[in-house]
Swiss-Prot record:
Biological classification of the source: Bacteria, Bacillati, Bacillota, Bacilli, Bacillales
InterPro entries: Trp_synth_b_CS, Trp_synth_beta, Trp_synth_beta/beta-like, TrpB-like_PALP, TrpB-like_PALP_sf
Species of provenance: Bacillus cereus (strain ATCC 10987 / NRS 248)
UniProt gene name: trpB
Entry-linked CDD domains: Trp-synth_B
One GO CC term on file: cytoplasm
Alphabetized NCBIfam families for the sequence: trpB
SUPFAM superfamilies registered for this protein in UniProt: Tryptophan synthase beta subunit-like PLP-dependent enzymes
Needed cofactors: pyridoxal 5'-phosphate
Catalysed reactions, as listed in the record: (1S,2R)-1-C-(indol-3-yl)glycerol 3-phosphate + L-serine = D-glyceraldehyde 3-phosphate + L-tryptophan + H2O
Subunit structure: Tetramer of two alpha and two beta chains.
Residues modified to N6-(pyridoxal phosphate)lysine: K91
Stated name of the protein: Tryptophan synthase beta chain
UniProt keyword terms in alphabetical order: Amino-acid biosynthesis, Aromatic amino acid biosynthesis, Lyase, Pyridoxal phosphate, Tryptophan biosynthesis
Pfam family, any one: PALP
Length: 397
């Protein structure tokens, strides 16, 4: 399979690109230049690997979930344990890389957006480590859902700005963070949290996250002497999935499955299943599949999980859907909750609600596969942050 994206203009087929105001174009080009140089600099790579190993705690284990495997009665189920990273999710793979890049570019301050608060915490964490000032924009609704993470960010020295505009969720936080970046661009780096935004952000985030898939490949081959038959990851903006899928894209014998949030059901208005129900448009500087109405107004995304309710999806996922290399599915709030409880009770591992969507789909898939086949789930984060809201949800039900 001939797959070489993005092209030099930052396009993934028709997707991606740089739809930014003139005021940002210079910074985006400067970032691309700095990133290319850093990637070719052995000293930068060495420093990054040092922090990934000694600070983040990589490599993360590839765990054979024997009880889940027996329960499904099909393929062997493995979990790539991104929940065991420092800060409890995959997000820090990207924030540590981008923060080192910010230091290299001579920036003193970092701005970021956050939904569930995981990216905010991971950003505040690396800013504390590297002595950078940190401003985090978070939707008002998410601030309410994720009080603990807000307190964590403040403990780490970040300034958290609550965004009341729009629906008070991730999309609105991104708008405000971009606005802030435009007016502080001389001394501030924007750490985008997912494979979104104008080029080179989707590529930078993918590259820093692809440590997940590279490790998985090596670990699975060491354990089973072959590659897995299937790999499953959840998708909001799509960074954990892109990090897991990218190293497997050329291995066509490995089936790749992305799992979106179906919320209350894709037949309702309350879901975040962009690739299932969306159409092509431009949001936050990039062309991608979006949830929008006929007038092109962005629709609200809904999911029980704060990290999946983004109304768009990364440009590279948009391309991978079109060329059929990844197949995309969706899981409802209720199915994700069921999978959350099942994994917790069967394996003693409390997954994030985001990751629970991947677990739910993987269970259906594993049951249809043969016993000598293998399936890997990207367990993108731990569920501590969700326990409180799950308790509320279960009490209401």
């Amino acid at each position: 399979m001939n797959y070489a994206y993005p092209d030099e203009k930052g396009h993934y087929g028709i997707y991606g690109g740089r739809y930014v105001p003139e005021t940002l174009m210079q910074s985006v080009l400067e970032l691309e230049e700095a990133y290319k140089e850093a990637m070719e600099d052995e000293a930068f790579q060495k420093e990054l690997n040092h922090y990934l190993k000694t600070y983040v705690g990589r490599e993360t284990p590839l765990y054979y979930a024997e009880n889940m495997t027996k329960y499904c009665g099909g393929a062997k189920i493995y979990l790539k344990r991104e929940d065991l990273n420092h800060t409890g999710a995959h997000k820090i793979n990207n924030t540590i890389g981008q923060a080192l890049l910010a230091v290299r570019m001579g920036k003193k301050k970092v701005v970021a957006e956050t939904g569930a608060g995981q990216h905010g915490v991971a950003t505040a964490t690396v800013c504390a480590l590297l002595g950078l000032e940190c401003v985090i924009f978070m939707g008002e609704e998410d601030v309410r859902r994720q009080k603990l993470n807000v307190f964590r960010m403040e403990l780490l020295g970040a300034k958290v700005e609550s965004v009341a505009a729009g629906s008070g969720t991730l999309k609105d936080a991104v708008n405000e963070a971009l606005r802030y970046w435009v007016s502080h661009v001389h001394d501030t780096h924007y750490i985008m949290g997912s494979v979104l935004g104008p080029h080179p952000f989707p590529q930078i985030v993918r590259d820093f996250q692809s440590v997940i898939g590279k490790e998985t490949k090596k670990q699975y081959e060491a354990l089973e002497g072959k590659l897995p038959e299937a790999v499953v990851a959840c998708i909001g903006g799509g960074s954990n999935a892109m990090g897991m899928f990218y190293p497997f894209v050329h291995d066509e014998e490995v089936a790749l499955y992305g799992v979106e949030a179906a919320g209350k059901g894709v037949h309702t208005e309350q879901h975040a299943a962009t690739l299932t129900k969306g159409s092509v448009g431009v949001l936050h500087g990039s062309m991608m599949y979006l949830l929008q109405n006929e007038e092109g107004q962005i629709q609200e995304a809904h999911s029980i999980s704060a990290g999946l309710d983004y109304p768009g999806v990364g440009p590279e996922h948009s391309l991978l859907k079109d060329i059929g290399r990844v197949s995309y599915h969706s899981i409802t709030d209720d199915e994700a909750l069921e999978a959350f409880q099942l994994l917790t009770k069967k394996e003693g591992i409390i997954p994030a609600l985001e990751s629970s969507h991947a677990v739910a789909y993987a269970l259906k898939l594993a049951a249809q596969m043969k016993k000598d086949e293998g399936l890997v789930i990207c367990l993108s984060g731990r569920g501590d942050k969700d326990v409180e809201s799950i308790k509320r949800y279960m009490e209401e039900v």
